[in-house]
Structure formats: C-alpha cells, structure tokens
Amino acid sequence: HCSYFTMAKCEQWKSHCSYCSQLRRYPACFAMSSVSKNFERKRRAFTGVKNMTLITPSKWLADLTRQSFLKEYPVEVHYNTIDTSIFKPTPSDFRERYGLQDKIIVLGVANVWEDRKGLFDFYKLAEMLDDRYVIVLVGLSEKQIKELPKNIKGIQRTNSPQELAAIYTAADIFVNPTYEDNYPTVNLEAQACGTKVITYDTGGCKETIYSLRSTIVAVGCIQNVAEFVLKQGKK
C-alpha cells in the first residue's frame, strides 16, 4: 500500500505484499490482514485492463513498473515540467528582509519536512558549517521552526510561486538531501533560477540535474554535501 518503499528496503511489491513495516505511513492501513487483500484487489483491477499504456514522470519509476505486475504493459516516460516564466532569476530584497546580506545561503525547500526529506541531515550539515553560512529551510511548521538550531532559519510554506522563485534566486546553493523521491521538481526550479543544486542519488533525482554546476552524491553522505558547500565559500 506504500507510496514509497526505498527507506524500508522492501521489495514485496514485485510479487505479493503481506507483512508491511509501514502500515501507518501514508496512505495508512489499519489492519495487517488488509495488506494482502489490497494488493490482490489492485492487481486484479489493473491487469484486467486490456489496452493500457502507463505514463511515469521518471525513468527510475518506469524501471520499477517493469518489475511489477504491470510489466506486460508499455511504459512511457513523460517528465514533469515547471513554469520557466515564473521560475527564473528573480531579484528581490529577501536577503535584506532577513538580515542575510553577508551570508552564504544554503537553501532547502519541501512541502512537508520529515525524516525522508532529510530534515535531520540539515541539522548535521549545520554543525559542519562555519559562521559565513546560514541554512534557510522553507516549508516548516511553526513547531519545527521553534526547535531549529540557531544557524538554521525557518520559513513557513509560501503559496506564491513568485516568492519561491525569489528565494531560490537569493540562495547560493540548493541542497536536497531527500531519501525517497520520484522526480523532485524543486531541483528543476532551483536550477532554473540560476542556483546550483546538490542532491542525494535516490529515485529519479539524477534525472533532474542538468546544470554543470549541480551534482549528486550517495544517499546519506552529508559529509560530501558539506564539502561541496564549503568549496563555494572558497571562491
């Protein structure tokens, strides 16, 4: 029933789901006995369609689809796109408003911040950076903002794409330490605004990197992220 199974290292979806270690994760299932029934119901529903072409937003997901009970169906990859009339270099007074004029801004953006999005990796990164740097995280809850260490600046979610583009532009580096993802468009948005990106090599993340100034590192290698970030301060 899982949306993601990377962190759980589960491959039951290839054959038959039964015991689920992520029973309460979205979308929550409240009875272990329902896991097997749900899997079989979905198998019957999808494989009962005679003429179907599957569309995935990444090659990574397309490859997984070919390992599932959907493997008999053709799969096409159609990447999600962003609006480059909005996500482009956008000058603003963001640095002045937050008193960050002389700081090297390391940015992170998520709709919901949790362990799989790498929130606590930013905590580790903050300990590795000197006073020239400030980490700015967009999308945090009020509670999360109150719990931040002093060298991380928290901002609640913005519903304005234009404001988000201005924040991307103000940043020096965009860091996406995601542990589970499909095709994160935040990487596309940051690069479109002229900001270099470093992201973990999970899911379809590598497919989002197109700028020669951006890079990927192995999942969980926050030390490599820190080295990349610190190099920017030497320029």
Listing of model-derived features with the role each one plays in the protein:
Residues 17-54, 69:
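Membrane-proximal helix-turn-helix segments that form the acceptor-binding/catalytic region
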Residues 66, 81-97, 146:
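Acidic anion/phosphate-binding donor-loop and adjacent secondary structure
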Residues 99-117, 123-127:
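Conserved donor-binding/catalytic core segment of Leloir-type glycosyltransferases
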Residues 139-162:
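Nucleotide-activated donor-binding/catalytic signature segment of Leloir-type glycosyltransferases, i.e.
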Residues 166-171:
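Short alpha-helical donor nucleotide-sugar binding micro-motif in glycosyltransferases
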Residues 179:
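Aromatic "clamp/platform" in nucleotide-sugar-dependent glycosyltransferases that forms part
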Residues 196-199:
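Short hydrophobic beta-strand element within catalytic cores of glycosyltransferases
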